[in-house]
């Protein structure tokens, strides 16, 4: 039996980009969350422990590790603070990939997810970098989402929709914002 770290990164990419319809990427489905937890829970734990370092030798392997940390965390731990716990790890991997120009070896569809940790960050400096990355990518819809994320961080310095889950007290302005359409992703 292979260990989680021996699982080939291609299985992650095949699942995310071939098995799943793109409409499932940004939705919320208990069935998908359960599937990801069942199929990839062990690999997720290996990623959290830093055991997938061998994947980083190839741009696609690094992307797979980012998807596991950034996207699968949100599925496996939906409605839990743990959904965001690996964001820092995923961001560092994405920053290293971009510094090494590894993103140039990925398809546009793959680059969307390589850049996603930037969009998920609560740092305005990182959000500014996110805008540059998504603008250069040239996919208008993704750029609009990056801009919406940026604008929330520019206004509040954090994502108000995470406050309750993370035990943070919301300001009056944040509470009013949370009543607006499009205040959560």
Which residues make up each language-model segment?
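Intrinsically disordered, low-complexity activation-like regions
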Residues: 1-63, 68-79, 83-185
């Amino acid at each position: 039996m292979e260990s989680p770290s021996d699982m080939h990164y291609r299985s992650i990419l095949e699942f995310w980009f071939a098995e799943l319809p793109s409409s499932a990427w940004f939705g919320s489905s208990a069935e998908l969350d359960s599937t990801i937890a069942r199929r990839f829970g062990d690999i997720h734990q290996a990623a959290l422990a830093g055991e997938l370092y061998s994947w980083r030798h190839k741009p696609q392997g690094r992307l797979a590790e980012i998807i596991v940390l950034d996207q699968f965390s949100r599925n496996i731990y939906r409605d839990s603070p743990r959904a965001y716990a690996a964001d820092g790890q995923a961001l560092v991997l994405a920053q290293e990939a971009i510094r090494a120009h590894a993103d140039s070896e990925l398809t546009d569809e793959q680059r969307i997810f390589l850049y996603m940790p930037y969009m998920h960050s609560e740092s305005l400096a990182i959000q500014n970098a996110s805008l540059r990355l998504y603008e250069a990518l040239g996919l208008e819809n993704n750029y609009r989402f990056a801009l919406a994320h940026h604008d929330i961080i520019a206004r509040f310095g954090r994502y108000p929709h995470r406050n309750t889950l993370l035990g943070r007290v919301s300001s009056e302005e944040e509470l009013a914002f949370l009543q607006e359409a499009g205040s959560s992703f």
